[in-house]
A protein has these predicted regions:
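Short, charge-enriched, intrinsically disordered boundary segments that mark the beginning
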Residues: 1-8
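Terminal helix-turn-helix DNA-binding modules in bacterial transcription factors
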Residues: 8-25, 44-80, 107-126
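Conserved hydrophobic/aromatic pocket- or pore-lining residues that grip, position, or stack substrates
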Residues: 14, 38, 253
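Sequence-specific DNA-binding recognition helix
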Residues: 22-42, 68-104
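A solvent-exposed interaction/effector surface
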Residues: 60, 64-67, 83-301
Length: 301
């Protein structure tokens, strides 16, 4: 089964069972892939998580049912998988901007979220440089924040996180003695989001005395043991602000490289390596920034 057919079959399965309790393992099975691979590919490809798609489709349908004037709020809430009218009302208002009761009024403005259909568009014909590398296990020390699953908020979340944790960053930079390279780690993916870390490799002397040197401040950090494994490594173009290119590159990997590669995404941390050399007044250096994406992969069975 090709990947487009597989994803469409999974979407069709969701739509056929939209008013029932959905099992994500069953959904992934329709695409002949693992739950982790399917959900990661789905979110990168579509720009939202599978859970967000299901929730938006159910709330869109709920608005239509209530606008007809015949459905009871409690019945619609149960069909959408909510345990109580209160939790349904909160979700409905967040999606539509009005309460379920207001949706039953004449001329109520509602939001629609259409069914997803995968279409084949002839793209590509472009070069993509990549390498497959067996990475050794490594230890990173970093600080994290839980990011929501909504990618529309990710840019703001990332920006706020970076601005609000400058002290944590400068401490690790000083201990690592690395000033032009920062690691990012994404792990613990779920319907609600994922853990996002800024991290650095620290020398042994810094790790040995970490708690003693930092005291209570050390509690702000986590030591991350990244397991050895196979990674697909791709790089953005060199420019002043390469972080803006990361999402587009990740989508290209999923749509252009992964489907015909014979590999799948495996359940391991996704690593980013931000190369940020700086030399005051030197445009050549300052326009040579780039980001490496390390996607954990394994051979498809």
């Amino acid at each position: 089964m090709d990947w487009i057919t597989g994803i469409q079959r999974a979407i069709d399965y969701v739509e056929e069972h939209l008013n029932e309790e959905l099992d994500y393992d069953d959904i992934a099975r329709q695409s002949a892939s693992s739950p982790f691979h399917f959900q990661r590919v789905f979110s990168i490809l579509c720009g939202y998580t599978l859970a967000e798609y299901v929730r938006s489709r159910r709330l869109s349908a709920a608005g239509l049912k209530l606008a007809s004037g015949n459905a009871k709020v409690i019945d619609v809430a149960m069909e959408c998988g909510y345990d109580s009218p209160d939790s349904f009302s909160k979700a409905f208002r967040a999606f539509h901007g009005i309460t379920p009761s207001q949706a039953r009024g004449n001329g109520a403005m509602l939001r629609s979220f259409s069914r997803l259909n995968i279409k084949v568009t002839l793209e590509g014909g472009n070069e993509m440089q990549y390498r497959l590398e067996e990475k050794p296990a490594m230890l990173l020390t970093g600080y994290k924040r839980r990011f929501s699953g909504n990618p529309l908020d990710k840019g703001e979340q990332d920006h706020n996180f970076a601005c609000e944790t400058r002290v944590e960053q400068y401490v690790l930079e000083g201990m690592s003695r690395i000033h032009d390279t920062t690691y990012t780690v994404m792990t613990n993916f779920s319907d609600s989001g994922y853990d996002f870390y800024y991290a650095y490799p620290l020398p042994k002397w810094a790790l040995d005395d970490f708690e003693d040197d930092l005291g209570d401040f050390a509690k702000r950090y986590t030591h991350l043991q990244i397991p050895a494994g196979l990674y697909l490594v791709c790089e953005t173009e060199r420019c002043m602000f390469p972080t803006a290119l990361v999402d587009a590159l990740r989508r290209r990997i999923v749509t252009e490289w992964l489907p015909t590669s014979g590999y799948v995404l495996r359940n391991a941390p996704e690593i980013g390596v931000i190369h940020w050399p700086f030399e005051d007044g030197n445009d050549a250096v300052n326009n040579s920034h780039y980001v490496e994406i390390w996607l954990p992969v394994s051979k498809a069975e």
